[in-house]
Each structure stands twice: as C-alpha cells, then as structure tokens.
A protein has these predicted regions:
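A hydrophobic, small-residue-rich beta->alpha segment in the mid-to-C-terminal subdomain
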Residues: 118-130, 134
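Conserved small/polar residues in nucleotide/adenosyl-binding loops
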Residues: 148-151
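Glycine-rich phosphate/pyrophosphate-binding beta-alpha loops
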Residues: 109-112
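Non-catalytic RNA-recognition surface used by pseudouridine synthases
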Residues: 4-106
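Acidic/histidine-enriched alpha-helical segments
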Residues: 10-15, 79, 129-143
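Residues within well-ordered alpha-helical secondary structure of globular protein domains
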Residues: 62-65, 121, 141
Length: 151
C-alpha cells in the first residue's frame, strides 16, 4: 500500500487532450484535525493532531469572510506557480464528530498550500490565539512573509 492512499469514486471518459490539472472544473479537499491528547497510532500521517481544545463554532464564524472570490496571497506558498492569487472558494464546511474536526473545501482551483494555510489559521482561531477579526485581517493583508508560520 502506498504511504498516502487515494480512492477513485467516479470515472468519466474525457477528450484526448484533457489535462487533469488545467481542465478540472472542480476540486475538493477534505482536511482533518484530530483534537485529543493521546497520540495517533493508526491515523499517524493521515490527520493533524492538535492537543489544545478547539472551539469549532468560533472557526465557523470565519467562513463568510473567506468564501467567494478573494486575493489569497497570505495563504499561498512562496513556491506557488499560479499566475494570480485571486481564487474563488465555492464552499468551506467545518464539522465535528467526536474528536475529529473536518474541513471540506470546494473550488475550481487552489493555490499551493492554500488549504493547509487556511486550516492553520482557523486552528489559531479555534484555540483562541486569534479572533475571527484577526483571521480576516490576515486574509486582507495579502502578506505571505508575516504569515509563513501557517504553512
């Protein structure tokens, strides 16, 4: 088994010059935080473990400020190859089931490290290290240098 297995849920025939990266009409990412103190065993490498208590409702307050079209410069990697930092986040869903916190992102395209940087910022909000207003200020700052710790 590969270190990071994937599952194919659906297949459709595509034209011969179809390019998976450039012709995709939608992408979905599911990111998971396991919020507990005991170490991960089976899930190690498949989820991000956070020991501090996380307030999911506080993180959800940030959703309206990030959905839609924005300049996501703050949340892009220095190695990002995208011509523009402007992307449209179609939806962000945050849910919790016991110790698991799920982040579901849907968009046509994402910047390099955009999802992990957003989740890192939302984690700061959930831990009460940042307020939802701090999150919005980070997005609006368009400053990759000051926020490199998010990646």
């Amino acid at each position: 088994m590969r270190p990071f297995p994937i599952s194919i849920l659906e297949v459709e025939k595509a034209h011969n010059d179809f390019h998976a990266r450039f012709d995709a009409t939608q992408r979905k990412y599911l990111y998971r935080i396991v919020n507990r103190k005991s170490p991960l065993t089976i899930e190690k490498g498949r989820a991000w473990q956070v020991h501090k208590n996380i307030d999911v409702d506080l993180m959800k307050e940030c959703i309206p400020s990030i959905e839609g079209q924005h300049d996501f410069t703050t949340f892009r990697s220095a190695h990002c190859q995208s011509d523009s930092p402007i992307k449209t986040l179609d939806s962000l869903k945050i849910s919790q089931s016991e110790e698991n916190i799920y982040f579901g992102f849907t968009a046509k395209s994402f910047l390099h490290h955009q999802v992990r940087s957003i989740v890192g910022s939302l984690k700061l909000v959930g831990e009460n290290s940042w307020s939802p207003n701090d999150f919005m200020n980070a997005l609006n700052s368009k400053d990759t240098v000051s926020y490199t710790h998010l990646r």
